[in-house]
């Protein structure tokens, strides 16, 4: 913060207005040579620190953790990498793979994965929107539909979007770009692509240009435009491409580049935590049932009779019932049976997760592990329901949570069972003649549609 202003030879006022520096960053090898020296000078001359925030960058190593060098032949040419994968995918990989202050084990296959799974998903989502928006001539010229009048799915994705804005803004503000990138990546792949767009496809396929279709376009446009702004500090090129393409058609923003716009601001009024929780439960049940289908080799087009879900609270029952139709449609099952007592049906097993217990309880971990494995069905049920459980041992109390244990259950005849946190799902895997015929009919229709 001294030489950059040619201080003390000139710019005294400029220097004083910018001292101490807000932020500096250098490699970890500069701890003594730079970080310490700046503070030492500031302490001697100004009785002050030299900077308010510092990040000590880690080193870029090869994928095996060795320092890159010409002698070892393990160096990666950055220009070849950028030419092959592009600067955005390279930047996104390097920032989201490890924290800036940690060493980065650079693996070229990781960039390829980012390009396919994140960049590809984001651009495919935009391409889906652009395809149907161009067909229908959507330019956002209609009056914007109030959020409270939109479908539950639209309100949910907008709620998640503003929750994301808040979290990303906090992460960047706390100098945690890795956390920000990972949050955005999860939102795009899991919330936007795998859930919102997939469940909304039929709304875009409709022939008529209805109010519901306009709502779908306006919602997806808003999400894509906001995402382009959120990713712009890390992925400057694809963000600008999406932003400019959107605004070329709508002219809603006069900025010529996403980098000349304001960063998104969270609207707390659009955040509905109850709705977010409800949809998260639906996503979790959907994932669990599809996993059970895969485990038992039952394709999704094969209808099944029933899902059985133990519910031990009115709140959980209310949340699942509110999205029951959506769940049944997604997993292709006829009905959900809710049970309030699973003791005669499911026998749970519990075992400790040492990776979680070790840092918390140290030398007591082994004794505590034995107590956990000795828990009865009522204790396991309490832990699943409340999310925590207290074990008393040697006149001491030890609090454990669902993150400290793994709860499993054996499959029961005719059923396949999965547990994830507080949710247990049992899938009826019996395929009757009637269900089999319905599955064949669905398969027949699918084959014909593919041929068309």
Language model regions located:
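Conserved catalytic-core segments centered on acid/base and nucleophilic motifs
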Residues: 26, 34, 230-233
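Feature 926 captures the class I aminoacyl-tRNA synthetase adenylation module centered on the KMSKS loop
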Residues: 1-3, 7, 45-83, 87, ...
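A short glycine/serine-rich beta->alpha loop
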Residues: 19-30
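Structured mid-domain segments that build the active-site/substrate or prosthetic-cofactor binding neighborhood
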Residues: 93-96
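Short Ser/Thr-interspersed hydrophobic loop/turn segments at strand-loop and sheet-helix junctions
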Residues: 37-44
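Short, solvent-exposed helix-loop connector elements
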Residues: 102-111
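Acyl activation and transfer enzymes in specialized metabolism, enriched
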Residues: 32-33, 442
């Amino acid at each position: 913060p001294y030489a950059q202003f040619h201080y003390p030879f000139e710019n005294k006022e400029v220097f004083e207005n910018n001292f101490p520096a807000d932020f500096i960053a250098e490699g970890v090898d500069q701890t003594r040579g730079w970080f310490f020296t700046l503070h030492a000078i500031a302490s001697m001359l100004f009785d002050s620190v030299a900077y308010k925030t510092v990040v000590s960058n880690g080193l870029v190593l090869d994928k095996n953790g060795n320092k890159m060098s010409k002698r070892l032949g393990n160096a990666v040419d950055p220009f070849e990498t950028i030419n092959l994968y592009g600067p955005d995918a390279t930047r996104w990989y390097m920032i989201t793979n490890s924290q800036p202050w940690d060493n980065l084990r650079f693996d070229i296959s990781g960039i390829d994965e980012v390009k396919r799974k994140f960049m590809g998903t984001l651009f495919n989502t935009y391409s889906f929107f652009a395809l149907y928006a161009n067909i229908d001539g959507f330019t956002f010229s209609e009056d914007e539909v109030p959020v409270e009048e939109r479908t539950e799915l639209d309100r949910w994705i907008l709620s998640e979007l503003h929750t994301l804005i808040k979290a990303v803004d906090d992460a960047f503000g706390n100098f945690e770009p890795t956390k920000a990138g990972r949050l955005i990546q999860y939102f795009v792949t899991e919330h936007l692509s795998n859930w919102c767009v997939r469940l909304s496809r039929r709304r875009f396929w409709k022939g008529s240009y209805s109010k519901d279709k306009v709502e779908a376009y306006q919602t997806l446009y808003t999400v894509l435009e906001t995402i382009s702004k959120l990713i712009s500090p890390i992925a400057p090129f694809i963000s600008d491409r999406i932003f400019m393409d959107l605004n070329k058609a709508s002219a809603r923003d006069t900025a010529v580049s996403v980098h000349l716009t304001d960063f998104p601001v969270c609207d707390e009024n659009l955040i509905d935590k109850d709705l977010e929780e409800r949809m998260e439960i639906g996503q979790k049940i959907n994932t669990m049932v599809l996993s059970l289908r895969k485990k038992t080799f039952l394709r999704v087009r094969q209808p099944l009779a029933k899902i059985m879900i133990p519910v031990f609270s009115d709140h959980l029952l209310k949340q699942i019932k509110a999205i029951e139709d959506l769940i049944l449609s997604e997993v292709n099952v006829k009905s959900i049976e809710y049970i309030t007592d699973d003791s005669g049906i499911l026998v749970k097993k519990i075992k400790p997760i040492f990776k979680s217990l070790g840092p918390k309880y140290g030398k007591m971990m082994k004794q505590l592990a034995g107590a956990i494995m000795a828990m009865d069905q009522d204790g396991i049920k309490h832990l699943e329901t409340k999310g925590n459980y207290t074990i008393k041992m040697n006149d001491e109390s030890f609090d454990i949570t669902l993150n400290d244990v793994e709860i499993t259950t054996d499959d029961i005849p005719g059923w396949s069972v999965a547990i994830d946190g507080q949710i247990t799902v049992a899938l009826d895997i019996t395929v009757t003649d009637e269900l089999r015929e319905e599955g064949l009919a669905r398969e027949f229709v699918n084959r014909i549609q593919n041929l068309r």
